[in-house]
Amino acid sequence: MGVADTARLIDSGRDVRAVPARWIDLGHVAPSSFHATYAGLAAAQTDGAPPIVVWARVAPHISLGRHQDADAELKCPLAVPVVRRPLGGGAAWIDESQHCYVLIMPLARLKGRPSEWFGWGLAPAVRTYAAFGLNVVRDGQDLSLSGRKLAGSGAATIGTCAVLGSSFLLRFPVERFAACIAAPSQAFTAWLVRALRDCLTDWESHLPAPSEEALRQAFRQALAETLGWTLVEDAVSPAEAHAIAQGCGEWEAGEQGPRARRVPYGIKVKRDVFLTERHVGDRFARVLTRSGRFEAVALSAGLPEAADVLLRACPPAFDALRRSLAGFVPREEAASWARLILETACFHSD
């Protein structure tokens, strides 16, 4: 997305190619401070305020989406802090191997629907990756490289601003993140590790990571090229600091949540991949789906490897699934197993 495309979504009342914007570098910060800062900054802005870019490296923590509950999603207590961020999306691991950024844009400057924010909001990151030779593309709210998720993002309206956050992921600790996710069995965690390795990637898996200064400068240049923002180094004002302090405890994960998983019985691995497991009495079904189809299924009744091959070709419909299972479980039980699989599986999420 170039400046001309962005102009259709951003209406500043003046030339979109010359929009002054504030760059606020927080340095290395604690998790709660990071999330409180961008939320407080957004809450303190007025309609005529310039856009803001918040840049930071954040201490290790699990960041939950605004509608997630720690007790439902995680193996609590954990050795790292848990913070429920004011943005959407699912559970994410954040640490110093990521460079986090948040774009804050007064709604008065925007034309598009919230679903369109990811187009302009992630365009600078795509341009930044390209500057280092990485062919990254946007896939909805995610950024992908060679078909694997490289970054996720979350957005929300805070005060009178659109807020969108993401990060440059240099290195991702797969096992450490998987060990934090609530699991009904050890096998679920093992499947999650394999799915994460298969579906996710990081910068260092493709190229040596750049220095923070090189990445910082490339991102600033990309913001100018894609959004037309002329960045000025700035700091939090006293009024903004007051707004930040007022909301500083608001995003702690101990706050009451929905007490249910965002994905029933499991987790969204990336945009079109879900891992779920459900136990009913002494029976269980574990299901990995990809692009609306079965990728792998395990049952307490036991399934041979040949079943996975057949199920991958099976549409997620009761009759088709029952017929496919009939060759691997007692025929009189095929219907109940088909029902359990379909009740367990997730093929899409909001």
What are these regions (language model features)?
Residues 2-75, 85, 155, 184-185, ...:
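Active-site loop/lid in soluble adenylation, ligation, and acyl-transfer enzymes
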Residues 76-107:
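A glycine-rich, hydrophobic loop/mini-helix early in the fold
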Residues 96-144:
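Contiguous, small/hydrophobic- and glycine-enriched helical/loop subdomains that border
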Residues 102-118, 201-210, 324-328:
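Short histidine-centered catalytic/ligand-binding loop motif
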Residues 120-128, 148-152, 186-188:
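Active-site glycine-rich loop that binds ribose-phosphate moieties when present
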Residues 138-183:
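A contiguous pocket-lining binding segment that forms or flanks enzyme active sites
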Residues 298-333:
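Glycine-rich, small/acidic residue-mixed loop/short-helix segments
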